[in-house]
Structures are given as structure tokens and as C-alpha cells.
């Protein structure tokens, strides 16, 4: 899976390495969120359950839906550890299943959006990573540190992106982009406007509330969450999802995590520059949005989209696998200067140097490290 890493804030900062394992199976747990209470600086585990984080004299929270949250205090003596998270028992509530009105639950979140979520204008410091594979061969891999300023964490469907969203690319940690050949590899990353849209929660809510049909498949409950699995036809939005999941917080009824799995479909289009026709069929596409607590509300924590797409182009067939990931690593109560902003409607890779080797502090898989070093 993806690897999202920490941002170095001091030249000789103490760095800790953690491995997170399932207490029952002793298997690695990917996507565990680790963040400090005061600064909210954080990171996430990779596919091997490993992470690196700059040590702070504070409580480090380790959180993953489906596991009991663990909190540990760290100081300058903390360097390396293997920690175990206990799985949470989830019990199916059959009574809730047959009476669960998902549309009503979504409407409550829409009506109370500004009470449940932190929507004040601010900069979210983020790590962004894209990884694209073409016919089982890596063709694009890079990671950026960026600042994302949002006016009020509301996606405006009819407004230009630059009006309510500003992004500054601060640095490139590493990059390797193979060739500039004119094929659909340059179109495989989620269209930038849609990428920015799905960073915000309100489009998911709008789609669900206005869905043509919603079929709740099951409802599960534990001490923290009501977990709803559903299919939906979004009708006029030209989008269907299946086996999608929402985690509702039992105390506030806010959405803590939402996963959309898109029903496969075929579309036809033209390549971005040469306008050569192509046909694409996603074999799967899924995107996931998560939130963590911040000042008695919820704040954007991470976003990930993965897709495997079959593309027919110039009488040839290509299989692409693409991943894009955002992870919030810090917060600034500032704005981004106009001269530092990029055009948010352009893909990030257009701003990235094609080849830059990262420093040893970054956690890469063996395959990724070999690709960067080529």
C-alpha cells in the first residue's frame, strides 16, 4: 500500500521508528494514524506496519478504526519500539439494520456540518504521494510536502477551485517519472478537480442525500462507531457505488470515516494533449476520507484513492494501477501568499522534477527504492 512520511522540522531532531502489529495475529497493520496531542504533527504506517516520526515531549496517539486506540508518552529517550493494537469486537445489530435511515443520518451531518467539523480557514500541512504502475512496471513515483489552505472546508461546485482552495508545493522528497510519452498515463491520476473535490466531505454528503436509491446492506456497532455498509445509485451525478462504508461516531453522529467503492463502468475520451481517442474501464476504484478530533470537533486527517484501469489506446491495451494519498501532518493559522500558489487545476506531477533521489529518512519499499535509484 502507500507510504506517507513525516516532515523534518529540525536538523538534528530525534526520530523514532515504530512497528504496529495486530495483538491477535501479530501481523503488520497498515494505515495506523500516529499524531501528537498538542501539535497534531503526525504520520501513518506503511504496508509493513512501520512509521517514522519526529519525537515530541508529548502524548502520541495511535489510531486505526477497528482497533482500540493506544496512547503513549514520548520524550527524547524514545527511539524504537514494536507496539500491539487490540482488535475491537464488532457486533451486528439486526434491529438497527432494518430500520436504519441512512439518508436521514446524512442529512443530520449536512445540517450540522459547521458544528461537527472544524471549518475555520487555515493551512493544513500535508504529505502527498502518487504512485502509478503501467503493465506491472512503475512509471511514476513521487512525494511532495505541501500546504493546503481551505476557506471553510466546503467544496463549491460552481466556483473556480482557486477561489476557495490554495495549494503551495513546498518541496519534493523524491521523484521518478518515466518519459513524457503521449499516452493515457498522464491522465491516470484522478482528474485534479475531482481530486480536490473528494478531499472535502460535503460532496459525499450531497451525493448520498440526493441519491436515486440507497440500499443498506448491513449495520454493525461497537462502543465507538455505527458502521454502515451500503450500495447507492447517485443518478444525475453519473456515479454508482457498492459495498461502501461509513463510520458514524456514536456520541456525536458525525462521520469519522467514509469509503466509496465505484461500480465498474466504461468511458471514452481523448488524450489530454494529442487528443487521441481512448477507452477506459476501471476494474476497481476506491477512495477513503478520514477525520481525527481537534478542539472538540473533527478535522481532515487523510485521503486515499486507488484505481486499477484497463485502457485501450491506439489499438493497444494497457493496465494501469494508480494510488494518490494525502496525509495531514501539521496545522498553521496562516494564508498562502499569492506568489507561492500553484494552479490547483493542474496535476501535481507537472510541477515535479522528473528525477530526484530522496534522503535515507524516508521509508520506501525495496521495489520503490530500486525504482528511485535507477
Regions found by a protein language model. Name each.
Residues 16, 24-38:
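Short, ordered, surface-exposed loop/turn motifs in non-cytosolic proteins
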Residues 16-23, 49, 83, 95:
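A short, amphipathic beta-strand motif
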Residues 1-19, 92:
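Bacterial Sec-dependent N-terminal signal peptides
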Residues 32-36, 60, 97:
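Hydrophobic beta-strand segments
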Residues 82-226, 274-374:
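Surface-exposed, low-complexity/disordered segments
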Residues 40-50:
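Short, acidic Ser/Thr/Gly-rich low-complexity loop/linker segments typical of extracellular
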Residues 202-261:
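Extended beta-strand-rich segments in extracellular/periplasmic secretory proteins, especially
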Residues 61-72:
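A short, solvent-exposed loop/turn motif at the edges and junctions
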Amino acid at each position: 500500500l502507500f507510504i506517507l512520511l513525516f516532515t523534518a522540522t529540525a536538523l538534528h531532531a530525534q526520530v523514532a521508528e515504530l512497528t504496529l502489529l495486530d495483538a491477535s495475529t501479530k501481523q503488520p497493520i497498515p494505515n495506523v494514524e500516529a499524531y501528537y496531542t498538542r501539535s497534531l504533527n503526525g504520520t501513518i504506517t506503511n504496508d509493513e506496519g512501520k512509521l517514522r516520526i519526529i519525537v515530541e515531549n508529548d502524548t502520541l496517539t495511535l489510531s486505526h478504526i477497528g482497533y482500540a486506540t493506544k496512547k503513549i508518552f514520548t520524550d527524547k529517550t524514545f527511539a524504537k519500539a514494536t507496539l500491539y493494537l487490540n482488535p475491537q469486537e464488532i457486533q451486528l445489530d439486526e434491529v438497527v439494520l432494518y430500520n436504519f435511515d441512512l439518508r436521514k443520518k446524512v442529512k443530520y451531518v449536512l445540517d450540522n456540518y459547521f458544528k461537527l467539523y472544524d471549518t475555520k480557514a487555515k493551512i493544513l500541512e500535508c504529505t502527498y504521494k502518487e504512485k502509478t504502475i503501467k503493465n506491472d512496471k512503475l512509471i511514476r513515483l513521487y512525494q511532495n510536502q505541501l500546504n493546503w489552505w481551505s476557506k471553510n472546508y466546503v467544496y463549491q461546485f460552481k466556483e473556480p477551485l482557486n477561489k476557495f482552495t490554495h495549494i503551495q508545493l513546498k518541496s519534493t522528497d523524491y521523484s521518478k517519472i518515466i518519459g513524457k510519452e503521449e499516452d493515457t498515463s498522464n491522465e491516470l491520476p484522478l482528474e485534479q478537480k475531482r481530486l480536490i473535490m473528494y478531499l472535502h466531505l460535503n460532496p459525499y454528503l450531497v451525493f448520498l442525500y440526493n441519491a436515486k436509491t440507497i440500499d443498506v446492506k448491513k449495520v454493525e456497532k461497537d462502543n465507538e462507531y455505527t458502521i454502515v455498509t451500503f450500495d447507492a445509485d447517485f443518478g444525475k451525478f453519473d456515479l454508482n457505488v457498492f459495498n461502501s462504508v461509513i463510520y458514524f461516531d456514536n456520541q456525536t453522529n458525525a462521520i469519522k470515516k467514509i469509503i466509496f467503492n465505484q461500480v465498474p463502468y466504461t468511458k471514452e475520451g481523448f488524450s489530454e494533449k494529442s487528443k487521441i481517442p481512448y477507452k477506459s474501464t476501471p476494474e476497481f476504484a476506491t477512495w477513503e476520507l478520514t477525520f481525527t478530533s481537534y478542539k472538540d470537533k473533527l478535522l481532515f486527517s487523510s485521503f486515499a484513492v486507488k484505481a486499477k484501469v484497463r485502457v485501450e489506446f491506439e489499438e493497444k491495451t494497457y493496465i494501469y494501477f494508480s494510488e494518490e494519498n494525502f496525509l495531514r501532518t501539521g496545522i498553521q493559522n496562516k494564508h498562502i501568499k499569492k506568489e507561492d500558489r500553484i494552479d490547483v487545476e493542474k496535476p501535481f506531477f507537472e510541477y515535479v522534477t522528473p528525477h530526484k533521489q530522496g534522503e535515507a529518512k524516508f521509508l520506501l519499499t525495496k521495489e520503490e527504492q530500486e525504482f528511485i535509484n535507477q
